[in-house]
Curated annotation (Swiss-Prot):
Pfam families: Com_YlbF (PF06133). This is UPF0342 protein SP_1372. It comes from the Bacteria. NCBIfam families: PRK13676.1-1 (NF010209). It comes from Streptococcus pneumoniae serotype 4 (strain ATCC BAA-334 / TIGR4). Belongs to the UPF0342 family.
Length: 112
């Protein structure tokens, strides 16, 4: 029987070899090469982190957060590099969701 960590590392390498992973990486590299897209992306990630911190402390985002999220949505949709990145990321997320189901299946069985 192989070491479970070896299997996890093999899975990691397999993910990096997927065309969808490579497409997300290429899209992210394109964002990094464009000052406007990079700024929006960095600001968006900081905003997401801020929302996560609120959620972790049990606080609810107020109306200003909703307005800010809508603003980011418009900026992302209006920038072809960013919209391409998020589209490619969603395609990769399908694999990650499937893998998550497979990995957590034994744990789910324990709870039944």
């Amino acid at each position: 029987m192989s070491n479970i960590y070896d299997s996890a590392n093999e899975l990691s390498r397999g993910l990096r070899g997927l065309p969808e992973y490579k497409a997300v990486k290429a899209a992210k590299d394109a964002i990094a090469a464009d000052a406007e897209a990079s700024k929006i992306f960095t600001d968006y990630l900081a905003f997401q982190e801020e929302i996560q911190k609120l959620a972790q402390t049990g606080q609810m985002p107020d109306a200003s957060f909703q307005a800010k999220m809508e603003g980011f949505g418009k900026q992302i949709q209006g920038n072809s590099l960013l919209s391409e990145f998020f589209t490619k990321q969603q395609q990769l997320a399908i694999y990650l969701s499937d893998i998550e189901k497979i990995v957590f299946e034994p744990v789910s069985e324990l709870l039944k």
